[in-house]
Amino acid sequence: FDLHIRLAHRCGSLAQLGQILGQAGISLEGGGVFATGDSAEAHFLVADGERAAQVLRAAGLEVVAHTPVLVRQLNQQLPGQLGSVCARLAAHHINIHTMYSDHHNRLILVVDDVAAAAALTPEWQAQHAHP
């Protein structure tokens, strides 16, 4: 699941998030944080989105959403893979809301329709199980 959290853009916000999840035994498998102005949008890959959201909300953090993701493995030796995946989805009107990679160098995509996106991109199926 993609866990979307809105943080204050201040020193220590990300540390707080990491400590809360760590104390709850929840591992972050990939993600990123993007700050604009006074807030920061954090997206992290977790195995149990509902539990992670509950833990963070109980600690007073703003969880925007926890969403199923599409996991794909790109051939890093072949230039243009990202463009090919994105073009395939765009041609079928599937919008990509968020994209990042995980600790296994897999592409993590938050899209409009995970099932349809998966059916359209079988050649990029990730080989490893994902959270």
Q: Which residue stretches match the model-derived regions?
A:
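A conserved regulatory-domain signal marking ACT and ACT-like small-molecule sensing domains
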Residues: F1-P131
